[in-house]
Amino acid sequence: MLMISNCSRDLLQRHFSNYHDPSASEAPVAGAGPSVAGKTPIACLNCSQAKTGCNKEVPCQRCQDKGLHCVQRYARRTSKLAARSQAAATAAAAQASRVAQVTPVTVQQSLPNVSVSIEPSQTLSQIQPPLVHEGGASVTMDPAILEMPLMNSFMKQQDPEVHDGSSPANSITFPLPIHLKAESPRQRTASVDLNFNNMNSEPSPPSIEPMEDQSWVNSLMSNDPNFGPGNMFSSTYDLGYQLGPSYADPTTDFSQMSQSMLQHDASMSSMEFAGSPSGVSPFGDLSTSNSEPSSSSWGSSHTRATSICSAHCLYDQSGEFDVTSNSAKQGLPISTDSDVILTEAAWPMARCTPPIYSGACPRTALGHLQRLEQKSSYQGARPFAWHTLERELSSLNWDNADLASVVPMNSQTRDSLMSISQRFHARALDIHRENDPGRDKSPLGSNCGPMSFLNLPSSKVLEFFMKSYVRSLTSFYSLVSEGRIDPNQMHRNDPASIILMLLMIAQGASAVDSEDARILSMGLIETCRISLLDIIDKNVEMSADPTALRAALLFAHLGAWSGDKWLMDIAMGQRGMYISMLKHAGMLTAQPPICPVLDGDQGQKNSWRLWLQVETKNRLVYDWVMVDQELSLFHDTDPQLDVSELRASLPCSEKLWKSSTVEQWADAVQCYLSKGNPHPLTPPSLYHLYREFLEQKLVDGRVGLTAHQLRLLLHPIQKMLCQQRQTLTCFSDMFVPDQPGHVSFSKAYVMRQVEVVRSLLSRWHDLAMRCLNMNPDCTIMRTNMVLYHLISLNAVTNFPEIESFARQERYDGSYWGSRHQRCIYNRQQAVHDCGQVFSILRNLPTDRLPTWWSAAIYRATMILWADSALQSQSQAHASLSPPEATEGQYAMNAPQDFNHTLDYNVIPYVTRSDGTPFHLDRHSEVLDYAICAIDQGASSRLGEGIKRKLIALGNNWH
């Protein structure tokens, strides 16, 4: 509770008697306008904004003269709300079916403080639930309210010095909301475990529909002066589930709820909240006296516009309390997984089923934010909000010995992180509600949204998600400097760093197979997406900030592989915008060579810091190159970046990058200088490396390439192949040979260009095998081989045509053999590459799989399925039996030489995980194998969506 000084208490009493005393509201006000339906008209909206006089007519004279649309306003005082509530309660009291006689209590008309007399020898469990009498109506107080710790705190914290003569020493006033209405026969009940002493026990979730009962709590938060975006620990508390069934009932009148009921006292300060890792209550000492009347949180409509708005939101025309949330009123139910599943047919990738388009897709972004907000409160018990997630993560024990370390997050960092993320989350909710077409367009509608509350998991869980982020992403992207992630050092109270940390948590949560982790991940992705655009719009210099662009990189990666149609579309669309920011910031251009100063401690430190800034930007550029390559590969689009623009230096060695001290870095630099490298801190750019690759200067093996450099070399090769493939699709199926005597631009010419690209891929394969033989267990290099085989598949197949065939589109009645040739140009090479994709991904550790691994399985599966289905259709139309394997069988997922042959009479087969083979002459078995492979791998929303698509494909072709 809150300590109120004598001066403030006198001022509060004077304010209450002037504006909220029911007796004062009975007398007519001189000069007031005529009352309309119990409402007192005041100045219209236009006049009030212009601060001019208004005759309070409809329309008023000023609006008529100026041709404005006049919007009438009415006074909404607490006394009028109480009068309407009392009138409605009196009408309902006539139909009361039962009346119980228990200890009488006193009900004040303005503030219904329930006074319960307690004998010294009487315990809380022996107190009879009071009955409120008002005009013949009766309502029982739920006994569960007297058992809750909040009630115990009110009884234990009474100060005997503040009692006056009107209240005995053992009489306690409960400022509880009492709805003067008979109980409904269908009144809901809930059993809530409120034993806060045993914090480690699993809570029993109430059986009440969460959002139906939580909407009034959000509305209370929006009108609480102590609650705001910057205050992460609200003084309000979700009482909808703690007050028992009689107070969680939607018919309960909370219009007169006292603010003191929503305060926590010092008796709860020793509890170890999930939101307070230090074990100290974040609510502090909030004790106050009960001898003075508390100001209603709904009052003072003339001092806060939110009071008018809250009344508009919480009460219907009859004055009854309405617990339906704004989202439900506006037709915006909380999004569930079914909404995300409905949008899977509109994905920009994996389009093997009949597509739908954006206009027919449900909106999921607002639902993700609301689900995160709902989960944060755990149906009214915030200390247990992420209890299930903590229990699930406690059983996981990952070995991160070979990865960057994560410094434990202290309580101060977590508190600040949650405070700023609360503001981000509220901003995101406001934007989505403002853009809702079904939203209330009245002047009061813009402020009627319930205030959100975002409660992050404990520091231990956040640390686990940081480790999950390191494990799932930093193996493929060089994002972590100095060999560790220190969230306490990263946090600088600037928005870009907070957004980056939240996206790290979202990435780590997305890699965990847990429903709670997915809720947290999807909510944070949408929150950070809007916040990132906000900070760049407000400060254009942030478009060149490495931290903001690194956060944009994480969002593009998370959104593209999220499995949510809207996030995938936005990530693909904003990829070009953020890449343009990189260009305009000058990060793609070459920088002057860095000459390290190794003499003196200060010189070494300055050189290290300067190099670290330049190296961070260079690694950010080439991380964007890898993301650009992945998104273009799996979405069948051109890469955004051009190799001729990539003049920034390639990343330096990992030994330099992971040096945690100046001494380690200086020793590593000295080691490279002693080996004859004159510029160890300024490697060549990707442009220069690719030029040497084209000139075959890298074939002799004198230049040792790292796994990351080989990965980057695939980007320009893939871009060249995309250009040739687009040109190839413009030709018809009819073969037109080149005319002798001059070079013509024909399909044969383009096919020769494709063969040139295949020769470059073969040259890259030789370099990669040399690197892989030196380190066979390198996860990065094995992932590079998967990308290589997928790019090679694009050189011998037409994947968009294969998906069109799966959707049974574009069939012009031509022969099936010609369509097979239109989908797969080189069957032998295609079958080999698909088998290698299966083999490599199956042998990778589950926790080291790349995020897009299920999409790679999908592409290989679709090519093998199309090959089998097209051959079956061709044989069926020709009335021929399938050929027998006369020349043996080909294990397509076994290691093979790059140059191989596969006869059409040979039936390829795949070896399952148990060692048993199955042949690929039946396209249904190909789909079954892929579905089982996805089930055995790391779980993700993307993988589950692809599995559903493959099942639907099998049903369509059954």
UniProtKB/Swiss-Prot annotation:
Disruption phenotype: Leads to the accumulation of a large amount of shunt product scytalone.
Main location as per UniProt: nucleus
Segments passing through the bilayer: none
UniProt xrefs under PROSITE patterns: ZN2_CY6_FUNGAL_1 (PS00463), ZN2_CY6_FUNGAL_2 (PS50048)
Coiled-coil segments on the chain, per record: none
InterPro entries noted in UniProt: Transcription_factor_dom_fun, Zn2-C6_fun-type_DNA-bd_sf, Zn2Cys6_DnaBD
Biased composition (Low complexity): 287-301
Recorded superkingdom: Eukaryota
Record-linked Pfam families: Fungal_trans, Zn_clus
Presence of the UniProt keyword Endoplasmic reticulum in the record: no
Induction, per UniProt: Expression is positively regulazed by the cluster-specific transcription factor pfmaF.
DNA-binding residue intervals: 44-70
Residues annotated as signal peptide: none
Keywords for the protein's UniProt record, in alphabetical order: DNA-binding, Melanin biosynthesis, Metal-binding, Nucleus, Transcription, Transcription regulation, Zinc
Function: Transcription factor; part of the gene cluster that mediates the biosynthesis of dihydroxynaphthalene (DHN)-melanin, a bluish-green pigment forming a dark layer in the conidial wall that protects the conidia from UV radiations. The 2 transcription factors present in the cluster, PfmaF and PfmaH, coordinately regulate DHN-melanin production. PfmaH acts as a pathway specific regulator to mediate the expression of Pfma cluster genes including PfmaJ, leading to DHN-melanin production in conidia, and regulates the conidial formation.
Record protein name field: Transcription factor PfmaH
Species of provenance: Pestalotiopsis fici (strain W106-1 / CGMCC3.15140)
